[in-house]
Every structure is written in structure tokens, then in C-alpha cells.
């Protein structure tokens, strides 16, 4: 917030002040943080001028938040990349939004289905975003069938002789 021109007074709770509209900024993040990227997008959406975040997080839920902001009138480019560009608008409007499924939750249910040796189908709207996670599960011997709106896991197909994670 301070980089955008807000003044933060360390009280409890924090007192955040600004004289006028926040100013667009170019920011280089030390690492790709979901929270930092989402906060940047929300602030930059109504900041004056343009803002750029380098090393932005690009997870599906970050993209979903940016899509919601777009539906409210925000001008955001670079979704799914490490460079997020936002041109601030004077005001955002209301919108209707459906929050996508959480990939951690979907993966947890798939893991439960896998370790119990059964067959479990998870209905989800994020199947296309689960590819990397499914690849890792397949290394452990799990098998999957996917459709546009579901993932079915079939339990263990091989014995695990040692932990998957190697010593660092």
C-alpha cells in the first residue's frame, strides 16, 4: 500500500490513509506470492495510471480473482504469466461470481480415494488445472480418468518401497 502512496500508521488496528487516489507503480516481487499478487491486483485496479507486477503468482485462483475484477471493469493483462499489468479505473462495478473449486481440496479427496484402494470420483470445475498434481500422483501408482467436470481415481497399483521424497 505504501508503494502506491498510502500512509500507514502503526496502530491497532492499522490506520491506513491516503490524500487522493493511489498512484500506479511498477513492482518487482522477490518471489511469486499468491497473497501479494492478489493484493496488488485489487489495489492497482483503482489506482491512477498503470501498474505492473513482475514475478506475479499465476495459480488458477489468482486468475479467478483477476477475472472477477475484470468483470467489475478492471483492465488487467498478463493472466497466467509472471507479469501482471493493470490499468487503473476510476470505479469498479458490482458483479456476480462463482468461486472455483480449491485445488488443495480436490487433491486431498483424490489422495483419500487413492490410499483406500478404492475408486472415487470428484466432481470439479478445475480439471484442466490439475494436470501437474495428477502427474505426481501417477508416480505413486494412482490411475485417473478425467472429464471436463470430474476426476476419478483408482487406488494403488504398486507397492511403495520407500518414501517418495528424497533427502535434500
Spans of model-derived segments:
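Structural preference for solvent-exposed beta-strand-turn elements
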Residues: 1-168
Amino acid at each position: 500500500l505504501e508503494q502506491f502512496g498510502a500512509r500507514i500508521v502503526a496502530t491497532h488496528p492499522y490506520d491506513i490513509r491516503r490524500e487522493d487516489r493511489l498512484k500506479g507503480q511498477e513492482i518487482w516481487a522477490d518471489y511469486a506470492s499468491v497473497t501479494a499478487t492478489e493484493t496488488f491486483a485489487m489495489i492497482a485496479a483503482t489506482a491512477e495510471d498503470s501498474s505492473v507486477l513482475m514475478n506475479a503468482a499465476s495459480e488458477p485462483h489468482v486468475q479467478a480473482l483477476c477475472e472477477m475484477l475484470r468483470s467489475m471493469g478492471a483492465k488487467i493483462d498478463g493472466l497466467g504469466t509472471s507479469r501482471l499489468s493493470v490499468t487503473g479505473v476510476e470505479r469498479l462495478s458490482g458483479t456476480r461470481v462463482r468461486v472455483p473449486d480449491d485445488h488443495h481440496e480436490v487433491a486431498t479427496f483424490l489422495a483419500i480415494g487413492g490410499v483406500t484402494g478404492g475408486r472415487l470420483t470428484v466432481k470439479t470445475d478445475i480439471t484442466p488445472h490439475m494436470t501437474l498434481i495428477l502427474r505426481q500422483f501417477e508416480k505413486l501408482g494412482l490411475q485417473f480418468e478425467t472429464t471436463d467436470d470430474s476426476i476419478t481415481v483408482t487406488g494403488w497399483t504398486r507397492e511403495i518401497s520407500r518414501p517418495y521424497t528424497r533427502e535434500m
